[in-house]
A protein has these predicted regions:
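Cell-envelope/extracellular polymer assembly enzymes that use nucleotide-activated donors
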Residues: 2-4, 22, 33, 188
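Short, well-formed alpha-helical segments that are part of the catalytic scaffolds
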Residues: 12-25
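A conserved acidic beta->alpha catalytic loop
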Residues: 22, 38-48, 69
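Short beta-strand/loop segment that forms part of the nucleotide-sugar
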Residues: 31-40, 63-67, 94
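Glycine-rich, basic loop-to-helix element that forms the pyrophosphate-binding segment
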Residues: 67-84
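Short aromatic/hydrophobic "clamp" motif used to bind/position activated sugar donors
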Residues: 89
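Donor-binding/catalytic cores of nucleotide-activated saccharide
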Residues: 94-200, 210-225
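Membrane-interface aromatic/basic loop that binds lipid-linked glycans or pyrophosphate carriers
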Residues: 266-317
Length: 317
């Protein structure tokens, strides 16, 4: 088996057929399997998938794997990793879809650069973070320091697991399973990826359509909830900083803090923020300059953060 496509599925009845159709019509089908992970949603997503599979008569085997209860997207992806038989894994979200030549182009890159642990694809998306154009990326790199720095430069490489063709053996050997119960599972996974990838190739052709479907009100609520979880992720990150690109990693964490501070609502999160800022300030002689440079991008953030009165005075000393 060459490629295992993994689709974590939960309450996407209006979209999953299009996702499955994009897989069924791939120009590359040699040794491809598709695993639909049923994460026990409350709509007809799985019924739609079952009907699609029943009507399909092509060469790609589709399999639905059922969870006994809802466990979340991380657990669904982990189930897919464990059940996959392919040399490569390809994650796709059920409300997204691929161009019909996606796997063919991915496998062409994998064949051309066999030492690459992963092939990073390009995406049809309005957001800069998911796109590769304009970033002067090579077709291939095995410079581990360069790879790590690029992964940890904000908005340079996509933090998501989807639209990456990645060797299953590499994922398993490095324990790159998804942290279950965390809402920032992609960023947690990306941090681990940055520290283990030895070689990477880039497919600059756009082959993946990313969709944002949820209403803005729901997204606002989710953002606040995710920001709360991000504090726990950041606390793990500050204890796992590499000397050779310390400043890049510190800047990455400071930038994350800057972006979530407007959503801080609880005493616990204020304490997390103060603890993170103080820890980072002690990590490097350049931490103070890095923090000031980043937070000066948005003066309103400084004014809204009560703890910055004391922290800024420390940074300016």
């Amino acid at each position: 088996m060459n490629i295992s496509i993994i689709i974590p599925t939960y309450n996407v009845q209006d979209y999953i057929a299009k996702c499955l159709e994009s897989i069924a019509t791939q120009t590359y089908t040699d040794g491809v399997e598709c695993l639909v992970i049923d994460d026990c949603g409350t709509d007809n997503s799985i019924a739609v998938a079952e009907q699609f599979i029943a009507d399909y008569s092509g060469p790609i085997p589709f399999q639905i794997i059922h969870h006994e209860q809802n466990k979340g997207v991380s657990a669904a992806r982990n189930t897919g990793i464990r059940q996959a038989k392919g040399k490569y894994l390809y994650f796709i979200d059920p409300d997204d879809w691929m161009t019909n030549d996606c796997l063919e182009k991915m496998m062409n890159m994998a064949t051309k650069y066999p030492t690459a642990n992963l092939i990073q694809g390009n995406t049809f998306c309005n957001s800069k973070w998911a796109r590769l154009e304009g970033k002067k990326l090579p077709a291939f790199s095995d410079d581990r320091k360069w790879i790590k720095k690029k992964f940890l430069t904000l908005n340079y490489l996509p933090t998501t697991c989807w639209n990456k063709l990645i060797k299953r053996e590499f994922v398993v050997d490095n324990g790159l399973f998804f942290k279950e119960g965390f809402l920032h599972e992609d960023e947690m996974w990306q941090w681990g990826l940055s520290k283990t990838v030895r070689a990477i190739a880039f497919l600059l052709d756009k082959t993946y359509h990313y969709t944002i479907l949820r209403p803005s009100g729901i997204m606002d609520t989710m953002t606040k909830k995710k920001d709360h979880f991000l504090f726990f992720v950041l606390e793990l990150w500050v204890e796992d900083i590499d000397d050779f690109c310390k400043d890049e990693q510190i800047a990455y964490i400071f930038e994350k803090i800057r972006r979530i501070t407007p959503n801080i609502e609880t005493e616990e999160d204020w304490e997390h923020t103060e603890r993170l800022l103080n820890t980072l300030s002690a990590k490097s002689k350049k931490s103070k300059r890095i923090a000031l440079r980043i937070f000066q991008k948005s003066p309103r953030h400084l004014q809204s953060i009560r703890l910055w009165g004391s922290v800024i005075s420390k940074l300016l000393k």
